[in-house]
Regions:
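Condensing-enzyme catalytic core mediating Claisen C-C bond formation in acyl metabolism
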Residues: 1-53, 157-234, 238, 242, ...
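Short beta-strand segments
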Residues: 12, 84, 116, 141-147, ...
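Short acidic, glycine/serine/threonine-rich loops at helix termini
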Residues: 22-23, 92-94, 126-127, 152-157, ...
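Acidic-glycine-rich active-site phosphate/pyrophosphate-binding loop
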Residues: 30-39, 91-105, 143-149, 209-217, ...
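Claisen-condensing/thiolase-fold acyl-transfer catalytic domains that form or cleave C-C bonds
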Residues: 57, 61-62, 68, 87-88, ...
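Anion-binding (especially nucleotide phosphate/pyrophosphate-binding) glycine-rich loop
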Residues: 70, 74-106
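Short glycine-rich phosphate-binding loop at a beta-alpha junction
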Residues: 76-84, 255-264
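Flexible, glycine-rich active-site loops centered on histidine and acidic residues
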Residues: 134-168
Length: 336
């Protein structure tokens, strides 16, 4: 829960992978009997990418290869692979293992593990990576967030079924070799809070040891994701102001020295709520309309977009922030 400061960390490489298949609102509205324009009005999403035959590990490996190339590095430079995703490819073995296999280094011995905090997984992985690198435990870490949300969406809940998209993103992080214009890339502040009173507001009950395959109580609907969007927003509003003030004093009513905000692309209303904090719209990066909510891949995929558009440059200070199932709140302030 504590907010630490100034751990050197360089995002040396960054990339994303989007499935080729684009699913438009018109397609979903026609297929599921929804009124024309309903999806955009309700969710803020205009299209989303969805897999055809791609697996989570395949998408993650594709993003990882490009991120390594972007960093000018190879897998021989990587000490640890962190799968930071909310949707596992299978229960056992861990998706990190499957990503390693997809990368073709199955005999290299690179440790591959997972960090699972649903939509906040990438932020938690960044924070943990900075700590591990600062401690000298690892030098360079490959973080992969890969999500096939479409596998567990319930068509009976159009507000959720139409909101989510599939995507993967990867980042190579390491200790910065030198400052840029006198500014050292670092995580300046990071904070996470969880309020388990909201545990049932965003949940997929099946797939674990409670509603297991041999449990006679298991029903098909237990394997679908359910989210009470208004309930999540209410809980976020209750704790959001205090959380932001703990992350950095003054953040609940302005951005002070923050150059850009990369929020989790949770929903139209979730993004709209950011205006209540006095954050200028020009400093907020949005990809919800074109990608949908891509769970843990949302923040790194949007970060990638900001860099490629030239909105985020070396030496800029950026806020990565959002919520995840739990309900969990997370925020990281870093110099890119």
């Amino acid at each position: 829960m504590s907010t630490h400061t100034n751990l050197p960390l360089l995002i040396a490489g960054l990339w994303r992978y989007l499935p080729a298949r684009i699913v438009t609102n018109g397609e979903l509205e026609a297929e599921h009997g929804l009124a024309a324009g309903w999806i955009a009005r309700y969710t803020g999403v205009h299209q989303r990418h969805r897999v055809t035959d791609e697996s989570s590990s395949y998408m993650g490996a594709q993003a990882a290869r490009e991120a390594l190339d972007d960093a000018g590095m190879t897998l021989a430079d990587i000490d640890l692979i962190l799968n930071a995703s909310g949707t596992p490819e299978q229960s056992i073995p861990d998706t990190g293992v499957l990503i390693q296999r997809q990368l073709g280094v199955h005999a290299a011995g690179i440790p591959a593990i997972s960090i699972h905090a649903t939509c906040m997984s990438f932020l938690v992985a960044l924070d943990i990576s900075a700590t591990l690198i600062a401690a000298g435990r690892y030098r360079s870490i490959l973080i992969v967030s890969t999500e096939v949300s479409s596998a567990a969406l319930n068509v009976r809940e159009p507000e959720n079924f139409t909101l989510f998209g599939d995507a993967a993103a990867a980042a190579v992080v390491t200790a910065p070799p030198q400052p840029w214009n006198g500014v050292l890339p670092a995580i300046h502040r990071a904070r996470f809070e969880t309020y388990s009173e909201g545990a049932d507001l965003a949940a997929l009950p099946g797939g674990g040891t409670r509603l297991h395959p041999n449990n006679p109580a298991l029903q098909p609907e237990h394997n679908f994701f359910h989210m009470d969007g208004p309930g999540v927003l209410r809980l976020t509003r209750r704790y959001g102001m205090s959380f932001l003030e703990q992350l950095q004093p003054g953040l609940s009513h302005g951005l002070e020295d923050i150059d850009l905000v990369i929020p989790h692309q949770a929903s139209r209303m979730g993004l709209k709520m950011l205006g209540a904090f006095g954050w200028p719209d020009t400093k907020i990066v949005r990809t919800l309309d074109m990608l949908g909510n891509c769970i843990a891949a949302s923040i790194p995929a949007t970060l990638y977009e900001a860099v490629r558009q030239g909105r985020l440059s070396r030496g800029n200070k950026v806020l990565l922030v959002g919520t995840g199932a739990g309900i969990s709140l997370g925020g990281v302030i870093l110099t890119y």
